[in-house]
Amino acid sequence: MKYSFVSLLQRGSIGSKQFIFFAKNEMSPLKAGVPGAKFLKYTVGFTLGTLAGFYLTNSRSAIHEYVSCPTVRLLTPDAEAGHKLGIWLLKYGLAPRLWFDKDEELLHVNVFGKTLTNPVGCAAGLDKDGEAIDGIFAGGFGYVEIGSVTPLPQPGNPKPRFFRLPMDEAVINRYGFNSSGHDSVVKNLQNRVSRFINSYFCNDINAVDNLSLYQNKLLGINLGKNKNGDEVQDYLKGVEKFQKYADVLVINVSSPNTPGLRGLQKESILTNLLSQVVAKRDSLVSSGNVLGAKTHRPPVLVKVAPDLEEEEIKAIAEAAKKSKVDGIIVSNTTIQRPASLITEDKNLVAQAGGLSGKPLKPLSLKALKTMAHYTKGSGLVLVGCGGISSGADAIEFAKAGATMVELYTCYAYRGPGLIARVKDEITEQLKRENKTWSQIIGEDVK
């Protein structure tokens, strides 16, 4: 009598020779009528599909750095088109995410009365209009900053205005505060909060007290001024509009692409501006926030340039202390073109605009060290930004005085896996030194 493969298995009487026979003959994928073959085919297909799906959606997968990102750059020779494509993918949840994102405790950091799960943030400029906040957080960031946002919609500077320097892992931009304006960004934020409240994940809105809508993560909103706007009133309008949506408010006075903006960094002008911003923020505390809190007092940070002499940095430190802001982001892009640039196209290098990416690191780190010296003991929180592309870079900034760090350009070049890699590298080095992130902040400040 001839038994089927399944019946032999059920009888427990299949030997090695019989198994090989059935594997070669009865379970051949060509025999579509055999139930065992169909089951095996579907099982293998489902398993392979699941594994492929996990691999492709996991930001740690090497394919994103070595295939996906280079392919996007190849398909979008216009750098701004590539930027827009990236935001579109993040907005609709099509970008890879960091699966099993649980940060080790030694990465936790207390800042502004909150505990962040990790100190790695996304700098402003990636998501200018608050369209892709959740997609960015899904990459593993502890802090995401959107903007800059201007009161009225404005197109920014004429195109082309965004240029890649891939050999240097750098970009030059002269966007000029292109923004959809306050009302449009508020609508994006309102829709996001509404989706959160109505989702089945939100059983108790009071369980989340951060406006990022994530426990132990913060959302910053970077405020700018219109090209022909008032240098004080535009920022006050931003505070009034976004106070109830932001965990952190950032005053951007350092973009090189808005005429006269960097002039706001002069001590007397900056002290006046920041003092009025803080006063406006304090006047709105009792207005609460969109999550129903009765009071809300988001910290105010000011973002400054790296192209400053020591006396200018000292003056900014004094302005920050006098105005009682909560911190300083060091730094924005640079108008310098460092000698270290290896891009051979001199016309490309000579494009007007701010340079960001790896070549910015020496300038931003130097500015941070100087700022840390002049703010030591003041309680001001320093955020390091500019050219950070590794865990070693992040630790260098922390030891120079940064409580948190931000990155953007290298994230665009290396892909979504960079965030996990940076956190892994920080963790490994901290373990070697037998320290936590909090313990190394300002370690080298003199």
UniProtKB/Swiss-Prot annotation:
Sequence similarity: Belongs to the dihydroorotate dehydrogenase family. Type 2 subfamily.
Pfam families documented for this protein: DHO_dh
Biological process annotations from GO: 'de novo' pyrimidine nucleobase biosynthetic process; 'de novo' UMP biosynthetic process
Name used for this protein in its record: Dihydroorotate dehydrogenase (quinone), mitochondrial
One of the record's GO molecular function terms: dihydroorotate dehydrogenase (quinone) activity
Residues spanning the membrane: 42-58
Cofactor(s) annotated in UniProt: FMN
Active site, per annotation: 255
Taxonomic source organism: Kluyveromyces marxianus
Enzyme class, first EC level, given as a word: oxidoreductase
Gene: URA9
InterPro entries noted in UniProt: Aldolase_TIM, DHO_dehydrogenase, Dihydroorotate_DH_2, Dihydroorotate_DH_cat, Dihydroorotate_DH_CS
Record keywords: Flavoprotein, FMN, Membrane, Mitochondrion, Mitochondrion inner membrane, Oxidoreductase, Pyrimidine biosynthesis, Transit peptide, Transmembrane, Transmembrane helix
GO-annotated cellular components: mitochondrial inner membrane
Enzymatic reactions: (S)-dihydroorotate + a quinone = orotate + a quinol
Binding site for FMN: 124-128, 148, 222, 252, 303, 331, 357, 387, 408-409
Signal sequence bounds: none
Compartments, record wording: Mitochondrion inner membrane
Known pathway: Pyrimidine metabolism; UMP biosynthesis via de novo pathway; orotate from (S)-dihydroorotate (quinone route): step 1/1
